[in-house]
Amino acid sequence: MTAFLIRSIIAALCLTLIVLPAQAIRETDSYDGNIFALYAGNGSLVPPAVTLADSLQAGRTSVIVYYLDDSRTSKAFSPAVSELQRLWGNSVDLLPLTTDALQGRADSDRTDPAHYWHGIIPQVVVIDGDGKVLLDEEGQVPLEQINSAISQATGLPAPQGESMSLSFNELNTEVISR
């Protein structure tokens, strides 16, 4: 009887210790973690290296991307943000910002990211070195449109050709410009 109880307890412990695999699904509004690491293969995008205030003060081109980690539209757009970093590198300040901290907050001035946010995600704002907004679009903004605004802001040529998405598994998609 004692042996049976011990075996039963061990079996119950083994069953409770079995960990189910984590599941991340791009087509849901569930929180899966850092969307850039998970869906774009680029966890280096967040947190941004500089603030909007620092970028504007330095006279650099700022590219703000408003997103939420638990939004299917943000998950789908994350590879495009990663591609922007690949294309423009150190020529622009790329600022992917989650909107959680902006909700219900009044904007103060043009150095505050809340000043530009409309309440829709994803949203892309391109601001040139003089503080002029060259692009302010919501949704799945085409990469070519963003590249054109960045080119106008920086004076650097935009990549030629169209972008295309390559999906190499059920989670990751890569956007490339050709």
Predicted segments — roles?
Residues 55-70:
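Short active-site neighborhood of thiol/selenol oxidoreductases, capturing the structured segment around
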Residues 73-88:
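Typically the conserved alpha-helix immediately C-terminal to a functionally engaged Cys/Sec
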Residues 22-51:
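N-terminal "domain-start" segment that seeds a small globular fold
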Residues 8-18:
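Bacterial N-terminal signal peptides
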Residues 1-9:
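Bacterial N-terminal signal peptides that target proteins for export
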Residues 82, 93-133, 143-145, 150-154:
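Thioredoxin-like thiol-disulfide oxidoreductase module
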Residues 139-178:
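Thiol-/selenol-based redox modules, centered on thioredoxin-like
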